[in-house]
């Protein structure tokens, strides 16, 4: 039986009223129309709609005001930083010269001539300690080389 009884010759009329995309596209409007037709409280829905619109517009205004305030604060801060005269931090009067020299000195804020031995009192001199850093780095280097040799050996053993 090549043709189903009750359908057209090409057997496609059964799908003529089935439009899933169209029904999805119109679902929202159909629901809105249904609610408007059967709504027992039309004034309530209108006031709720107006209230929602008012809240949305007010929140938009508040957001815009906050954004403009933040932009203004950022611009003020940026211009305030750019208006700083950094030459004030490098003044050449004796007090600032002494202060700057003492801040850059490793000898406990001494601004005396440290190349002259009588000027260096023991509290201003850095502690004398033996230098063990080179030994530590030599050991670290040996450990790393041994680790690399071990990894290479394990890779070689696993490939055999």
Swiss-Prot record:
Write out the coiled-coil annotation as residue ranges: none
Q: Give the UniProt subcellular location, in the record's own words.
A: Host membrane; Virion
Please provide one cellular component term from the Gene Ontology annotations of this protein. virion component
Q: Where are the transmembrane segments?
A: 137-157
Q: Which UniProt keywords apply?
A: Host membrane, Membrane, Transmembrane, Transmembrane helix, Virion
Q: Any idea what this protein is called?
A: Uncharacterized protein R557
Q: Give the organism the record lists.
A: Acanthamoeba polyphaga mimivirus (APMV)
Organism classification: Viruses, Varidnaviria, Bamfordvirae, Nucleocytoviricota, Megaviricetes
Protein topology in the membrane: Single-pass membrane protein
